Amino acid sequence: RQRQMCIRDRLDWFLLAEPEHQQMKEWVKALLHLYKSHKAMYEMDQSWEGFEWINADDGYRSIYSFMRHSKGAKKNLLFVCNFTPMARDDYRVGVPRKKQYKLILNSDEEKYGGTGEVRKKIYKAEAKECDGRPYSFAYKLPPYGVAVFEF
């Protein structure tokens, strides 16, 4: 907003003409779609079984990862969030299973204001311990990036 928020004023819709605002709108739209289309985002919201930290202790690099689970852990989501301006070219994240992890949302896409660098969509976990998990995979984590994987 260009001016202070006021309940009586209309929203500054004209700002959507600026690329940064349009990109943020697209990102929020994608997050809302993720929420509505994946039960792991809401099905077990009232239970700790629906949420699991992968790494909540990487404060030095300001990178955090966690999982959201659906009932029966049939469809799960893995989130990796980088809160720094530094890219991590080979960031390794621990995972619970030796499966394929599909990248379904990437904040580094150009439409969200990212670099637009093309990344592969499928990552295969290997038997390499990381984050206290028996398996892991490496991912090129962009600055201020959020990646969401489905498994």
Segments (PLM) and residue ranges:
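Carbohydrate-interacting/catalytic domains
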Residues: 4, 8-151
